[in-house]
């Protein structure tokens, strides 16, 4: 590996490795540590980090906390997890497909916040949030009967526009929320700067 290649990429991990090895072989790796220290990127603060809904390094529990706070989800509908039992609205990331899904989202879809404030009559807020987690833009389609048991779907422009407006409101609310609480801000700023 050339010097340019060595001093690029994930230089934080390379420095950690070089620091571990230099203890046993200082004569071989002291120059590596010095060179890697000089190319370390500066840490960013929260205002310099752009986090979107759907970022996979945000923990599912934090996405749950956000949506529960935003929609004022009733306690009885919120996620409950233990070794032997789980219930309520829960957000999961499928590690194989890297798709997010919200389990039991129907528990609260009729609340005013879920159906009107951040949702529409055609698409509730939990469905909009799940679509947003998967980095997709919401689209509302109407089923059109063609006769003989056949049908097709057409985009409903008006309902799609309303749902996208709600989606954008959620995105803006998340940007304000994610770094608002100091402990959560520190956790994700540190994670971002270390990877």
Residue ranges and their predicted role:
Residues 194-195:
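ASCE P-loop NTPase motor core, strongest for the SF2 helicase catalytic module
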Residues 1-191:
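Charged, low-complexity intrinsically disordered regions
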